[in-house]
Amino acid sequence: MLSEVLLVSAPGKVILHGEHAVVHGKVALAVALNLRTFLVLRPQSNGKVSLNLPNVGIKQVWDVATLQLLDTGFLEQGDVPAPTLEQLEKLKKVAGLPRDCVGNEGLSLLAFLYLYLAICRKQRTLPSLDIMVWSELPPGAGLGSSAAYSVCVAAALLTACEEVTNPLKDRGSIGSWPEEDLKSINKWAYEGERVIHGNPSGVDNSVSTWGGALRYQQGKMSSLKRLPALQILLTNTKVPRSTKALVAGVRSRLIKFPEIMAPLLTSIDAISLECERVLGEMAAAPVPEQYLVLEELMDMNQHHLNALGVGHASLDQLCQVTAAHGLHSKLTGAGGGGCGITLLKPGLERAKVEAAKQALTGCGFDCWETSIGAPGVSMHSATSIEDPVRQALGL
């Protein structure tokens, strides 16, 4: 068991192209978003495990002795045990959560407890730890915040228990794990995601683990080997929506108008494939014209998504406001509100970006200037992170 303080971060994600079409067997491109979740793990000797989630105002403390008495025999299934309903009911009792706990805050506690017991049970005694998780990602906005959380928890616990290597053992300021360790972190993070979401696709945790960009189709994932650095505006309309209802709406429209809807889905697939091709070219030899192609693809995809029925007045407003400043946007994720992305090509006048941000904020939206294709899960020294993050984590 390591005795030092560990500081880990993992990125969120956005869907660049292919949302909704992916449900019907088409390609989706998911990219790591450089808004990150940070976790600091401090070993303790007070016989307690504490989890502090300041973004949602939760602090929970458990007695190690009580957790030690738990029959963790139920975790003995194979290498990475999948959580069963029976196990989750037992853990809810220990966590002091109501049986019908479905809120993300409660499920975050449950996912932590599950990963802590499952990963640390190989230690002679369960370790005393103080863990704080703070995120730049807004929760419930379709940006992979729960996956970034699960990836951070899995990476920190596996490193602390010496199940994976410590990337900073040679005193660097930032590091990542070797491929085998990343696979292990990803497997455990997926189980954390299962506690929170039931039956996730695995895309969010994979993007958060490896970073960069992933192509996903019918359960198969592959990494886009090279990715140019792309700057974006990410805008949260803050309009709540139900992903389930939006997916069901597309399905019923497909049944009602198969001759119209099937070609739309095929076109969206072609947009994803063209974007993948252009990104590959840009990574090898970037020319300004390629950004114009990316902008056109975003416009076309946005119109297709409106035709599928997953648009929203707030997203139309976002696209109109950015278009007035010569920028190109599309929804990302489920649609019906939620978030949109706007491409910022190199050499864009600063004043134009600021004016667009101001106009979006004036609509009541939240707006971030960030990048996509970000690094995956990383270990940091305290000096390698920015002051606001350090302060939020109490470092």
UniProtKB/Swiss-Prot annotation:
EC numbers for this chain: 2.7.1.36
Any one Gene Ontology molecular-function term assigned to this protein's record: ATP binding
Pathway: Isoprenoid biosynthesis; isopentenyl diphosphate biosynthesis via mevalonate pathway; isopentenyl diphosphate from (R)-mevalonate: step 1/3
Membership in a protein family: Belongs to the GHMP kinase family. Mevalonate kinase subfamily.
GO cellular component: cytoplasm; cytosol; peroxisome
Activity regulation, short description: Farnesyl pyrophosphate and geranyl pyrophosphate inhibit mevalonate kinase activity by binding competitively at the ATP-binding sites.
Protein name: Mevalonate kinase
Record key words, sorted: ATP-binding, Cholesterol biosynthesis, Cholesterol metabolism, Cytoplasm, Kinase, Lipid biosynthesis, Lipid metabolism, Magnesium, Metal-binding, Nucleotide-binding, Peroxisome, Steroid biosynthesis, Steroid metabolism, Sterol biosynthesis, Sterol metabolism, Transferase
Top-level taxon of the source organism: Eukaryota
Gene for this chain: Mvk
Binding locations of ATP: 13, 55, 104, 108, 135, 140-146
Reaction catalysed by this enzyme: (R)-mevalonate + ATP = (R)-5-phosphomevalonate + ADP + H(+)
Active site: 146, 204
Subcellular location: Cytoplasm; Peroxisome
GO BP: any one term: sterol metabolic process
Subunit-structure text: Homodimer.
Known cofactor(s): Mg(2+)
Transmembrane residue ranges: none
Binding positions for Mg(2+) per the UniProt entry: 146, 193
